Each structure stands twice: as structure tokens, then as C-alpha cells.
Amino acid sequence: MFLLYEYDIFWAFLIISSAIPFLAFLISGVLSPIRKGPEKLSSYESGIEPIGDAWLQFRIRYYMFALVFVVFDVETVFLYPWAMSFDVLGVSAFIEAFVFVLILILGLVYAWRKGALEWS
């Protein structure tokens, strides 16, 4: 049976690290002056009064680029520890990593064929 008192430092750090941001927001909310006016409600565009609607929508194509980037960024996160311990893991880990990369390459080819990587 494991002993819970061995985790006292962990729980102390968890409580302190959770309390510090909460206290920072609480103290800034209590000490900051609250002045509402028309200037606070206007949108800021480099010190110039906004002309027209200040709302800007992103095209859906940007979403696809971001999604493909996240997939390959996560791939890098998974492959880096594997590459650092490649000599210890052996051939089976190499085959598993190869299958992992192959599945991601198939996904990239599919996205490419569907036109997800074209900005037009």
C-alpha cells in the first residue's frame, strides 16, 4: 500500500499554484478603479475612430491550415521522445513509429487531394 504523506509536497504545490492566479485576479479586481464610459465601450484601432464595422471574420480555409498544423505538431511531440530513446527501444518501436508516420502521411495525402491545403 502506498503512503499518502509522500505526496504532501505535490498537493502543497498544486494548491499554491492554483491559488496564485485566483488571488491575482481577485486583488486586481478589488484594487482597480471601475470607470465606465463611452470610450471604454468603443473599439480601438490604432488610436483612430473605427470606420465601418470593426468585425473581421476568418475564412474557413484558415481553419483547415490550422488543423493540419496541429496534427503535424502533435506528431512531432510524439516522435521526439521516440527519437531520443531509439537505441534502447529496438526494432518493434521503429515499426510502430513507422506505422504512425505512415498513417499521418496518408492523412496528409487525403487532405491534399481534397484541396484542404489550397488557399484559393
From Swiss-Prot:
Pfam families: Oxidored_q4 (PF00507). Its main location: plastid. GO terms for molecular function: NADH dehydrogenase (ubiquinone) activity; quinone binding. GO terms for cellular component: chloroplast thylakoid membrane; NADH dehydrogenase complex. Its EC number is 7.1.1.-. It catalyses: a plastoquinone + NADH + (n+1) H(+)(in) = a plastoquinol + NAD(+) + n H(+)(out); a plastoquinone + NADPH + (n+1) H(+)(in) = a plastoquinol + NADP(+) + n H(+)(out). Keywords: Chloroplast, Membrane, NAD, NADP, Plastid, Plastoquinone, Quinone, Thylakoid, Translocase, Transmembrane, Transmembrane helix, Transport. It is an enzyme of class 7 (translocase). It is found in: Plastid, Chloroplast thylakoid membrane. It is a multi-pass membrane protein. InterPro entries: NAD(P)H_OxRDtase_bac/plastid (IPR023043), NADH_UbQ/plastoQ_OxRdtase_su3 (IPR000440), NDAH_ubi_oxred_su3_sf (IPR038430). GO terms for biological process: photosynthesis, light reaction. The chain crosses the membrane at residues 9-29, 64-84, 88-108. Belongs to the complex I subunit 3 family. NDH is composed of at least 16 different subunits, 5 of which are encoded in the nucleus. NDH shuttles electrons from NAD(P)H:plastoquinone, via FMN and iron-sulfur (Fe-S) centers, to quinones in the photosynthetic chain and possibly in a chloroplast respiratory chain. The immediate electron acceptor for the enzyme in this species is believed to be plastoquinone. Couples the redox reaction to proton translocation, and thus conserves the redox energy in a proton gradient. This is NAD(P)H-quinone oxidoreductase subunit 3, chloroplastic. It comes from Aethionema grandiflorum (Persian stone-cress).
